[in-house]
Amino acid sequence: VLQEAARVKGPVTREMIMLRDIALINRGESCSARYTYNNQSVPPLPINDSVQIRIKDQASDLIYFNYGETVFAIRRAMERCMHYGYSYYTMRMLTQCAILNGEKNNALKYLRLLSKTFFQRKWVEEMRPYVDGVKPLQESACFRMPLKLYREGTELVGTDDNYVEMTLNKKWMYTLTTDPEAQQVALGCAMIMRDQRCFWSQVQRYYEINRDKAFPTHVQEAMLFDVYERKVPGINLSFVKFDER
């Protein structure tokens, strides 16, 4: 994903940006490498066609799952089933959400259906140990980070009004957690939303959790910009360890 993101020239879609951000979150680089990539998205165009395709119709279940929001992921997956019928992709997503939620019976039901198809049997065999508890989810590349965000964040309720990215960013920029990886997600979302109060609140929380570590590169840049360019009053940067460069 990151290799493809680095190759893109010109504007990108919000979907491409969100999937790239998920890859950076999994690598722990959301606050240190995000702005080295292209974040200039394609401007919205007037929709005159009767068929409208949004992020929520294409990849919202995958995006919500990777942020640990299994309820919204299941909802969007089921909506796709209602519109377009069941697919192997949707059944896989429902299986992964059931595993993350600890819903063993549901997970087994989906796996049983998928096992009847020739090309899905290998994937079913890979998932079965996680359902049976033989393999811990924390050791899975697929489940490790979604599980952490599932446990550290609060569950989304209500509706996203079809705005997937804004819903997730707003939720996480207000989330206070003591887990270093989850807190970096919250800090990154505060920067994306350019919310000054949330940003400095998350900066303080990052410092409390990581007193012996330097702030990520983009966070240092944002702090310096706020103090010296935007002239935000009442900010003391004496506690910050800045990179020499």
Q: Model-derived features: where do they sit?
A:
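Short, surface-exposed linear patches
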Residues: P46, D212-K213
